[in-house]
Amino acid sequence: MENSSSRRKMLKQVAAASLAATAFPSINALASSNMEENTKLKGKINHSVCQWTYSYLPLEELCVLVKKLGLNAIDLIAPKDWPTLQKHGITCSMCYTAGKISLTEGWNRPDLHPQLIAEFTEAIPLVAQAGYKNLICFSGNRKGMDDTTGLKNCVAGLKQIMPLAEKHGVIIQMELFNSKIDHKDYMADKSAWAVELCKQLGSPNFKLLYDIYHMQINEGDVIRTIKENHQYFGHYHTAGVPGRHEIDESQELYYPAIMRAIVETGYKGYVAQEYIPTGKTDKEKVAALKKAISICDV
């Protein structure tokens, strides 16, 4: 699967009409066959899962599943679906307002600032009113722009929405992607560049979504980077390297050590699973998610 196109497709489509429920095996039955009722977790890591990676399930069924797995959050949910989460007592651990949001057309483009400022000015109060904290944003692609200019442009645009974010207690989080494989030409592809953006903005309400999978591909050195820059990281995503699949022994990252490093920083936010499951059956995919959570539950 082409990961970048899948993610872009999700961001464009999820805000449209909800996925119609079709004939799926009962998630209650699938979950019960793989775990005890309401899995007990250790509590040091706040676990979440990105909806788009389990989008074959209607959101209602995904909510039932995550509750049985002991989770209380799902990532990357648009406002139209927040009532469904709330009905199940689940929070949105990372919000986005679809609109014209784009991974490739972002804050490094001054010509897009008026549009982005308008969209985020509308979105920030919505997030706060729903009781949520995190709202995703993107740098955009370089398209020939050098990193210094891109940094300057991002600062100029983002600083215009930070007072509103601070007023409402909403944290704007820029996601880091690899530009080698999945998101070629994406600007925020290095943690050092993104940390400098945080420093120049100087707001506690701007942080980074540190995607462990993406940063392993682009720069490695994951644990040291987390330890030295954790104050700028407001959210984490996981996936196996290579392939962006399960985080088990089939890939190169040792997630228990990474999770322990995160816990040792005093981090209280969410870690969201964002791998693409390889299981052929729903039962296998449910078991894989349970295993991923167990691996990260240090």
Which residues does each predicted region cover?
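Short acidic, glycine/proline-enriched helix-loop-strand junctions
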Residues: 83-96, 154, 170
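Active-site-proximal loop/turn and secondary-structure-junction residues that shape catalytic pockets
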Residues: 53-55, 78-80, 98-100, 141-143, ...
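Catalytic domains of carbohydrate-active enzymes, especially glycoside hydrolases
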Residues: 62-81
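Active-site acidic/histidine proton-transfer and metal-coordination neighborhood
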Residues: 13-26, 41, 109-207, 217
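Histidine-acidic metal/acid-base catalytic patches
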Residues: 2-67, 131-133, 188-210, 214-298
